[in-house]
Amino acid sequence: MGPHKLGLRRLYRNLDRILLLFFIVFMMMEFAWIPFTSWAAESLLKQTGYEFLSYNNAVSVFSANWLVTTQFVILFLVNLLVAYSQIGIIFMGVRNLLDEEERTHFGFLKATFRDSWVMLLRARPSKVLFIVCYMGILFPFMRQILKIYYLNKLLIPDFIVTYLENQYYLGIAISIFVLILFLIAVRLMFAVPKIFLEKIPVRKAIQFSLDKTRKRLLHYSWHLSWIIFKSLFIYAFSILMLIFLQHYADTQSNMISLGIGIFNFILMKLAYYFMLSYFLIKFLSFLTDKALADYPQKKGSPWLRGFVLLISCLVFAAEGLIYLHFPLQTIPKTISHRGVSDGNGVQNTVESLEKTALLKPDYVEMDVQETKDGQFVMMHDATLKNLAGIDKRPQELTLAELTELDIYENGYRTKISSFDTYLKRANQLGQRLLIEIKTSKLDSSDMMDRFLKKYAATIKIYGHQMQSLDYHVIDKVLDYDKDIQVFFILPYNTIFPRTQASGYTMEYSTLDDNFVNKIWQSDKYLYAWTINTEDATAKSFRLGVDGIITDDVSYIQNSIKELKDNPKYATLLENKAKDLLNFPGN
């Protein structure tokens, strides 16, 4: 069995139904369920007595009140059921397109939601768990293009992925692991329609799929890969044509280029849903051996289809106007990561600070740790092994011993800098700092008290800011002087924090519109880290972050200048096209 041929005319005749179905599912999730579950999670967190949830307080949060923890578990399980239902509704809709029975738009929706209700009544924990694991882990392509909100939160932050990819053998191991997951997904893919569409247990559905793919793994892997490739090719080819047209339009007057840009934005969104429809129909047709029916055109149906498409185009046009005409909702601050830019020296050293300050970033982010003798030194890592080749912690050596050590990075060699020297030189250069306090179990109990007593006045006078992963640091700073801006670093976007921090420094790959909207409502600032790629930059601009922490200051500055002074609509459309696919890091 292979994929059935799918004529473009038949696909076009059903595009309006797909648009209608996705619009309804989107409205239910975006404006009903996501706000509700977000409110519920925040309410439960408040009952624990904690203001935030992060890796360093998760155990304390979930052990604070067992009744609340039970409610957290229930909310988590309900969200899994909602994700299962969201996928199921879409599958039922596509299945109804493959039926031989012709339906009106209302009949299509009625049948889809009726079948989805039956599917939900048949749901069992084993079915939900299988679908969540399949879509969330084994075949993440599905959850990405279908934009399954809660499954898309199952991702590894980009800074961890980048680290793993930079380790040669780990990179190879990850590639092999991803290939194995794909092959497992192929072995189990025929179980998916059985679970959704038939009243059989998961065990039998899995056995059916294993039997069907036995000794034909490469055959089915090729067919699934071909469906994915053709779907993405349709989208990519359409986007290339639109971008080519927009490049020409950008040479004309701004009014003409903006008008054509909005028109291309509409076509891009339609191309995305066309690609999505193509993939879903081909995928389910492949799994069920059913083809999309070619019904005779009824009188009046083109008008209804035209009306649905017209409304969709008007919505897309409004979205396109906002996206293209206001590419930068806020002008983000440019922040050098660890005091370097484009590998211009060794991180967290005075020599690199002097070079980076010439680029005039708004802030230079740097890292401070306590030493054995209660002084403060510039160091990011928990040990000295990477930079100095010594397996010691900064807290195990005195400041004098540390500043005598040679450190190496990016082809440069220098000495470790003390915080006193670094701060003094930054003040001389007129360079504001974003001072990150790194804490450890070896720190003295009065570390922050001594730090603030010695440096707080200078930090305030020169307009420096502070940040930390440790919320005790945030509390100490605010108790000492509420006028010092201090940011709480969050490596992962979970429950929205309700803290007294001036703002949040968030790992960019887990950021989403829901978090940013709440930031604006709470009158806090948002910094994103670490932004080094075109996709990450585009996402940060789109979300409207207040600051961008980067390893390449000049690149971010040029990107901001271009969007402010001479925005190229072709570039914006290209960024949006990538964003629509919603792959990790976008």
Indicate residue ranges for each PLM-predicted region:
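Phosphate-group recognition and catalysis centered on beta-loop-alpha active-site segments
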Residues: K290-N586
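Hydrophobic alpha-helical membrane segments
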Residues: M1-T334
